[in-house]
Amino acid sequence: MVAGIILNKITDILKNEGCSEVFLFGSHVTGRANEDSDIDVGVKGLDPSKFFSVYAKLDSEIDSKIDFVDFDEQSAFFNFLTSIGEIRKIG
């Protein structure tokens, strides 16, 4: 599981950029993460025009690979993750 301090930093960045909700999904939720795993983060409420600049900010400020998804744009994926229980709200 990814360290809490990293999750807090990710959440702080995303909330400051206007995200209303922040989610963790993937291997860090299912317990299959290893040292090479990326951190799968999804958001709701982010202005779509800010997506790439926010992703770049995460990339520059977090010393781990981030997979970043806008769940407002990918609602079917969000619903799927929710239905199988492989998502956790972190902010």
Identify the function of each model-found stretch.
Residues 37-39:
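Periplasmic OmpA-like peptidoglycan-binding domain that tethers envelope proteins to the cell wall
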Residues 42-44:
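Short hydrophobic/aromatic beta-strand micro-patches
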